[in-house]
Amino acid sequence: MQLTPQEKDKLLIFTAALVAERRKNRGLKLNYPEAVAYISAAILEGARDGNTVAELMSYGTTLLTRDDVMEGIAEMVHEVQVEATFPDGTKLVTVHNPIR
């Protein structure tokens, strides 16, 4: 299987997000990479589902709360940027202050 660098990045994000989701479901608090992967994967999937950039920017702020992450992580994640593939092309989605 031949994958482009972008496809490899998306696969890595998905794998990290899967680990994060399992840990979250077990009641563990997520660390920085897990939180970013969790939000990024949700944005990528939302774009694939046909949501708009504005919808995904809003949706990205609803995925995790301060209770879901380790102490200090919410302050570390100022924004999450994801280059997502939409039906009309690739666009950059930026979620500001995603963990509230």
UniProtKB/Swiss-Prot annotation:
Gene3D superfamilies: Urease, gamma-like subunit. CDD domains: Urease_gamma. GO terms for biological process: urea catabolic process. It catalyses: urea + 2 H2O + H(+) = hydrogencarbonate + 2 NH4(+). The keyword ATP-binding does not apply. Heterotrimer of UreA (gamma), UreB (beta) and UreC (alpha) subunits. Three heterotrimers associate to form the active enzyme. It is found in: Cytoplasm. It holds the Pfam family Urease_gamma. InterPro entries: Urease_gamma (IPR012010), Urease_gamma/gamma-beta_su (IPR002026), Urease_gamma_sf (IPR036463), Urease_subunit (IPR050069). Keywords: Cytoplasm, Hydrolase. The keyword Hydrolase applies. Its EC number is 3.5.1.5. NCBIfam families: PRK13241.1 (NF009712), urease_gam (TIGR00193). Pathway: Nitrogen metabolism; urea degradation; CO(2) and NH(3) from urea (urease route): step 1/1. GO terms for molecular function: nickel cation binding; urease activity. This is Urease subunit gamma. GO terms for cellular component: cytoplasm. Its main location: cytoplasm. Belongs to the urease gamma subunit family. It is an enzyme of class 3 (hydrolase).
